[in-house]
């Protein structure tokens, strides 16, 4: 298949390769900086890290304002409750407790340090007790571990004693054999000839 270029009536189209080369050369020399794929002069803006939006505080819910009648009714209900509780229970009333606490605070303003000292002493005693209990647990664990170590050491020593005893018995038997051969040589003058069985290897 052959390629062919047809001449058109339009004069703006290129007809020769020389014209195409000249056009490409001119476009390469006169190209704009904006057409560059990787421009060097362009400043790239830095990306900003995303920040969380500040949360707007919620508006407090509108509280219902109580009227004077409701306040009076609440006071009456509270007084009735206090009266019934005072009649039914032999314990002192709330007012008596508040008054006694206030009196104690006024009278013992100088003696406030004493309860704190007692509380601190109690804390020290409690911490000392906990330290003693921790120390006891630690010593118990150490004693248990030492007992385990002692049993293992005694087991190793018995094994070594058995090995040494076996070695001694072997040495003793070899010594008795040497003594018997020596006595045979002394008495007879020569050692006895003993035939050894020769093992034959199967092919």
From Swiss-Prot:
Pfam families: Pox_Ag35 (PF03286). It comes from Vaccinia virus (strain Copenhagen) (VACV). Interacts with the DNA polymerase processivity factor A20. Interacts with B1R kinase. Interacts with the late transcription factors VLTF-1 and VLTF-3. Interacts with the late transcription elongation factor G2. Interacts with itself. Might be part of a transcription complex composed at least of G2, A18, and H5. Belongs to the orthopoxvirus OPG110 family. GO terms for cellular component: host cell cytoplasm; viral envelope. Its main location: virion. Phosphorylated at multiple sites. Phosphorylation is necessary for cleavage activity. Phosphorylated by the viral B1R and F10 kinases. This is Late transcription elongation factor OPG110. Involved in the co-transcriptional or post-transcriptional endoribonucleolytic cleavage that generates sequence-homogeneous 3' ends during late transcription. Involved in postreplicative transcription elongation on intermediate and late genes. Also involved in DNA replication and in multiple steps of virion morphogenesis. Required both for inclusion of virosoplasm into crescents as well as for maturation of immature virions (IV) into mature virions (MV).
């Amino acid at each position: 298949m052959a390629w062919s270029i047809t001449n058109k009536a339009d004069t703006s189209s290129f007809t020769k390769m020389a014209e195409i080369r000249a056009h490409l050369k001119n476009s390469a020399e006169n190209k704009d900086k904006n057409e560059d794929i990787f421009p060097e002069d362009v400043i790239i803006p830095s990306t900003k890290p995303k920040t969380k939006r500040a949360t707007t505080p919620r508006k407090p819910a509108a509280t219902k304002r109580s009227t004077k009648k409701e306040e009076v009714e609440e006071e009456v209900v509270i007084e009735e409750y206090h009266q019934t509780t005072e009649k039914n229970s032999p314990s002192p009333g709330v007012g008596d407790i508040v008054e006694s606490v206030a009196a104690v605070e006024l009278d013992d303003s100088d003696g406030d340090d004493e309860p704190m000292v007692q509380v601190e002493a109690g804390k020290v005693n409690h911490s000392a007790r906990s330290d003693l209990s921790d120390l006891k647990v630690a010593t118990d664990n150490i004693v248990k571990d030492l007992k385990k170590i002692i049993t293992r050491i005694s087991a190793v020593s018995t094994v070594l004693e058995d090995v040494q005893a076996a070695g001694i018995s072997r040495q003793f038997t070899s010594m008795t054999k040497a003594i018997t051969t020596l006595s045979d040589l002394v008495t007879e003058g020569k050692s006895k000839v003993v035939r050894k069985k020769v093992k034959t290897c199967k092919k």
